[in-house]
Each structure stands twice: as C-alpha cells, then as structure tokens.
C-alpha cells in the first residue's frame, strides 16, 4: 500500500536525539497559524468593512454573536502569541547557527515580513482611535520614497486620506495574506526537512537519530498544550492585556491620541524608526531592522556553527536580546529625553550586532 509507506516514513522520520525545547516553537507557530486562520474566518463572517460600521460590528461580535467574544479575544491574543513564538524561533536560529541553512532562513525572513504586514492590516480593522492613527502614521512613511512616494500613498489609501476605500482594501489584504503565509510555511517546512534540522551542539546529527514519533511528537504536543493554556488563561482573566485603551474609542480624525504607538510586537521596529530624526532615514532603518536578518547566513565567519561553545558571541547575543527589549520599552514612552538618547543608543547596538558578530567569529577562530 503506497499510503501505508507514506504513513510509516512520516512516523519514522529520523530526528537528532538532542534537539531541545527551543526546537518546539515551529510546531507552536503552526498551531498559532491554524488558530488564527480559523478564528479569523468566523470573525470575517460578522465583520463589516465600512468606516461607519466597523467599530460597531466588532462590538456586535463581542456582545451578540454566540461565542463571538471567544473568537475575537482568541484572535487578538493569538496574534501576540504568534509573535512571542516567532521572536523566540528567530532568536533560537541566530543562537544555534540555523541560518546556515540559507533557503530555510531566507524563506523564514520572507514569512516574518508578510506576517508583520498581515498583523498591521489586522490592527487597523476594528477602526478604533489607535487603529486609525497607527495606520495614518505608518502608511504616511511611504511618502518618504523619492518621486513615487505620494503616488504610492494615494494609491494605497484609495484617496487623499485614510477613508472607507483604505479600510476595504486593508480587510481584503488581511484576508488574503494568511493564505500566502500558509503557502510559504509549507515551502519553509519542505526546505527544512529536505536537509534536516540542526541541533544544540551544531554537530552532524546523523550518528545519533531517533524516530520523530513518539519522542518529539509528544514534546511538541506538550509545548502546544502549554501555549494554548496560557492563551486561554489570558483570554479568561485579562482579555484586554495587550489592548491599547485608546482603541476602545471609535476612530476620530479630528482628535489625535497623546501617544501614537502600534501593537507591542512592532514596538522594536517603531522605536528604531522614531530614534532617527529624518523621515527617509527612519523609514530605511525600520525596513532594515527586519531585512538585516537576511545578512546572517552570508556573514558567518566562525568555524563552529552554534554559539554553545562560543562565550564571547554568547555575550553579544544576549546584548542583542536586552537591546531588543530596551527598544520595545522606549517605544512605549513619549519622544523626550532621556528616552530619545536611550532609543538611539539601543538602535545603534541592535544594528552593530550584525557587524560585530562576523568580526568576533573570525577572532574566535584565532584563539
């Protein structure tokens, strides 16, 4: 039976025996994707993409639709879970040198960019105060592009300001992009299992492999269960944990919030954008904060793949993590001293990681 052979081969997928919990975040991301797509579908059934009705339709989902509050809160908190998992997933990749599998790393970076775009479009849909003003600020960055900027912005808005056509196209994009994420995820997973995963030691795992099921499949199930438990605990007790208080008010183009900021998972990029007192420079820095990840496979100089046995690089890596958190924190603060200086320093350290890392790798080879 050919089907039996496929089942057997997936059951006996050989995997390195020493891959740790950090390798479980891929399956957790897949769970998040399934959760977001399914809850998103039920929300789309009841949502109305019209500037006069969008805010009311979200309230209608929460109050009147049976289990609508579960769908809406799971979708909103699920997005935060998605980004927590993806940031840990990327950090694991940087730490253990997984970026040397170039195709997997580059397809993953493309996935991150599309995911960020999808989340941004989704944040605009409830048409609350922060939704509207975050959309205004971020889409306005397109005007920084020389020659084409104003035309591109007008085209994206569907007019000369953010209005009904903008909301309609953002809803269309938010609906279609997850299917692109699903397609790219499939490619990402195929490319990964074509070569096989790395392990914490960074050594050749061929000498010691075990079947994926039951050993690693149960570990996956455990981590997914923990994640879903955390998600439902937040949803049950503090459903508005990640929400901005401004977003409980309907969008008003005549009243600007005191402090415009996107969702927490974009704050690191937003902090880098704000730290540069130039529109074009800030926009480029914003883009580079994510695109710079693509340089990692091409700037690796160490003879050792993983950071497990490289204490100098480990110190640099943890500096990057602290810097990431610092930028996120400063982006929540108003644009005034000392936050401007802290943000600028942290942004400089963030980018310097990708410059110092290859130099440090080369130095470690000489030790």
Swiss-Prot record:
PANTHER family: CYTOCHROME B (PTHR19271:SF16)
Additional note from the record: Heme 1 (or BL or b562) is low-potential and absorbs at about 562 nm, and heme 2 (or BH or b566) is high-potential and absorbs at about 566 nm.
Keyword Lyase set for record: no
Pfam families: Cytochrom_B_C (PF00032), Cytochrome_B (PF00033)
Keyword 4Fe-4S: no
CDD domains (alphabetical): cytochrome_b_C (cd00290), Cytochrome_b_N (cd00284)
Biological processes per GO annotation: mitochondrial electron transport, ubiquinol to cytochrome c
Spans through the membrane: 25-45, 69-90, 105-125, 170-190, 218-238, 280-300, 312-332, 339-358
Record: residues binding heme b b562: 75, 174
Source superkingdom: Eukaryota
Signal peptide: none
Species of origin: Austrelaps superbus
The protein's assembly and partners: The cytochrome bc1 complex contains 3 respiratory subunits (MT-CYB, CYC1 and UQCRFS1), 2 core proteins (UQCRC1 and UQCRC2) and probably 6 low-molecular weight proteins.
Residues binding heme b b566: 89, 188
Cofactors: heme b
Protein name: Cytochrome b
Keywords: Electron transport, Heme, Iron, Membrane, Metal-binding, Mitochondrion, Mitochondrion inner membrane, Respiratory chain, Transmembrane, Transmembrane helix, Transport, Ubiquinone
Gene Ontology terms for molecular function: metal ion binding; ubiquinol-cytochrome-c reductase activity
Subcellular location: Mitochondrion inner membrane
Cofactor: record remark: Binds 2 heme b groups non-covalently.
Membrane-protein topology: Multi-pass membrane protein
Residues holding a ubiquinone: 193
Chief subcellular location: mitochondrion
Family: Belongs to the cytochrome b family.
One cellular component term from this protein's GO annotations in UniProt: mitochondrial inner membrane
Function: Component of the ubiquinol-cytochrome c reductase complex (complex III or cytochrome b-c1 complex) that is part of the mitochondrial respiratory chain. The b-c1 complex mediates electron transfer from ubiquinol to cytochrome c. Contributes to the generation of a proton gradient across the mitochondrial membrane that is then used for ATP synthesis.
């Amino acid at each position: 039976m050919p089907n039996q052979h496929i089942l057997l081969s997936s059951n006996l997928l050989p995997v390195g025996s020493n891959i740790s919990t950090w390798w479980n975040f891929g399956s957790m991301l897949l769970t998040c994707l399934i959760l977001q797509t399914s809850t998103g579908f039920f929300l789309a059934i009841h949502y109305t993409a019209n500037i006069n009705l969008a805010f009311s339709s979200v309230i209608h989902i929460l109050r009147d639709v049976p289990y609508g509050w579960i769908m809406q809160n799971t979708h909103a908190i699920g997005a935060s879970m998605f980004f927590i998992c993806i940031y840990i997933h990327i950090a694991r990749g940087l730490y253990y040198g997984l970026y040397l599998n170039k195709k997997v790393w580059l397809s993953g970076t493309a996935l991150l960019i599309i995911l960020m775009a999808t989340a941004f479009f989704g944040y605009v849909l409830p048409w609350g105060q922060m939704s509207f003003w975050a959309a205004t600020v971020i889409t306005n960055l397109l005007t920084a592009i020389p020659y084409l900027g104003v035309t591109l912005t007008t085209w994206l808005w569907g007019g000369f300001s953010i209005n009904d056509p903008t909301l309609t196209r953002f809803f269309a994009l938010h609906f279609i992009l997850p299917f692109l994420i699903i397609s790219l995820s499939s490619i990402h997973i195929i490319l990964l299992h074509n070569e096989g995963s790395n392990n914490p030691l960074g050594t050749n795992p061929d000498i010691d492999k075990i079947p994926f099921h039951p050993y690693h499949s149960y570990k996956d199930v455990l981590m997914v269960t923990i994640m879903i438990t955390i998600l439902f605990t937040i949803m049950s007790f503090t459903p508005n944990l990640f929400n901005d208080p401004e977003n409980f008010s309907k969008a008003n183009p005549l009243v600007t919030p005191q402090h415009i900021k996107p969702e927490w998972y974009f704050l690191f990029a937003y902090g880098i954008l704000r730290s540069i007192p130039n529109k074009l420079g800030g926009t480029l820095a914003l883009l580079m904060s994510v695109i710079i990840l693509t340089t990692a496979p091409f700037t690796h100089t160490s003879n050792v793949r993983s950071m497990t046995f490289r204490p100098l690089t480990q110190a640099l890596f943890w500096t990057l993590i602290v810097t990431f958190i610092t930028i996120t924190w400063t982006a929540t603060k108003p644009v005034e001293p000392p936050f401007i200086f802290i943000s600028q320093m942290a942004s400089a350290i963030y980018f310097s990681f990708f410059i110092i890392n290859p130099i440090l790798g080369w130095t470690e080879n000489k030790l």
